[in-house]
């Protein structure tokens, strides 16, 4: 044993176990090759060429079926590439009469439409519950909710911005019902 072999043995880099695994791989390769009948006197290249020729003739003898071309009826459209249609730019005015009307407000926001909520003549407790629900819906949809006047609010879906201070605009026009 040479000096290098002793060092490799100490570091466990030259283990006899590795040799056993190498030998097992050698036998595994032989078992796979024995599955195919072969002539030991033939060269590998000729054997491979013959096997590919046999496989191609097997493919040729089977009846060929034409692949059926199917097209998907669903076309994915990303929101950023979608062009806004006039119906998407619609502003809906809803005058709720009970808390159940909040579902209509949320569905309208889900459809990407702006909602003006007119709660004039509604009980203050019911109006507060509707505003709380609408505020949660707008927040969940990354939208916005702003007060226009005492009992009129505007809720917008994601992608629709409200610019300016609507309350100050309403005060400047001195419209009835716009003051606190």
From Swiss-Prot:
Positions of the UniProt region annotated as Disordered: 14-81
Keywords in alphabetical order: Cell cycle, Cell division, Cytoplasm, Septation
Membrane spanning residue stretches: none
Top-level lineage group: Bacteria
GO cellular component terms listed in the entry, alphabetical order: cytoplasm
Compositional bias of kind Basic and acidic residues: 57-68
Keyword Disulfide bond: no
InterPro entries in UniProt: Cell_div_SepF, Cell_div_SepF/SepF-rel, SepF-like_sf
UniProt biased composition (Low complexity): 69-79
GO biological process, any: FtsZ-dependent cytokinesis
Compartment(s): Cytoplasm
Main localization, broad class: cytoplasm
UniProt keyword annotation of Ribosomal protein present: no
Biased composition (Acidic residues): 15-35
Function recorded in the entry: Cell division protein that is part of the divisome complex and is recruited early to the Z-ring. Probably stimulates Z-ring formation, perhaps through the cross-linking of FtsZ protofilaments. Its function overlaps with FtsA.
Subunit structure: Homodimer. Interacts with FtsZ.
Family of this protein: Belongs to the SepF family.
Protein name: Cell division protein SepF
Organism name: Agathobacter rectalis (strain ATCC 33656 / DSM 3377 / JCM 17463 / KCTC 5835 / VPI 0990)
Gene: sepF
């Amino acid at each position: 044993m040479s000096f290098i072999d002793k060092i490799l043995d100490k570091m466990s880099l030259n283990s006899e176990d590795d040799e056993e695994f190498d030998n097992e791989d050698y036998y595994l390769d032989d078992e796979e090759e024995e599955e195919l009948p072969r002539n030991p006197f033939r060269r590998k290249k000729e054997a491979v060429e013959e096997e590919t020729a046999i496989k191609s003739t097997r493919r040729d003898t089977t009846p060929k079926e034409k692949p059926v071309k199917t097209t998907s009826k669903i076309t994915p459209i990303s929101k950023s590439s979608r062009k806004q249609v006039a119906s998407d730019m619609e502003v809906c005015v809803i005058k709720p009469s009970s808390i159940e009307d909040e579902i209509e407000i949320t569905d309208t926001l889900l459809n990407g439409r702006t909602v003006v909520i007119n709660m004039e003549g509604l009980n203050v407790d019911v109006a507060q519950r509707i505003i709380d629900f609408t505020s949660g819906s707008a927040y969940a949809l990354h939208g916005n909710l702003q007060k226009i006047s005492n009992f009129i609010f505007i809720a917008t879906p994601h992608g629709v911005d409200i610019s300016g201070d609507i309350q100050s605009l309403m005060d400047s026009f001195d419209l009835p019902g716009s003051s606190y």
